[in-house]
Amino acid sequence: ILTTTYWGSQGILYMHNCKGEELWSRELRCNGAVITPVNWDGSGQDLVLLSASTEHGGLMDGEGDIVVPFPDDGHPELCCEVLDITGDEREEIVVWDLKSLWVYTQDRAKSKSDKTYLPIKYPHYNASNYRGEFCFPRWIES
């Protein structure tokens, strides 16, 4: 369970196990974090989108480490969202501001398997800027 709070500072993250015991905490340097689960590579190991910031954002693993940073390529950093745009069950990161919209996707082909990782997530029709996210593991026959 990953939560964010603004008590004392903006964007403090807490990771808890299923019993509510704190595993770790991090204080981010960015103003807020979307903490959205991401099925980035289809492996069943979900990552968490923090923000589109090249300095403080990226995709974080369950240990709190940034494992997929955003490149310093001039992309917008104002807003970001997680969507499966290409239809291969892996999710893309959409980043935008008032002038442009960019899409980041994986640089590798989807691996062939008898099962496909397709987690149960928050429905897009309920999307809001103030929402709680969930992600329950689910494997389906390919």
For the regions a language model picked out, list residue spans one by one.
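Beta-propeller-forming repeat regions
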Residues: 1-142
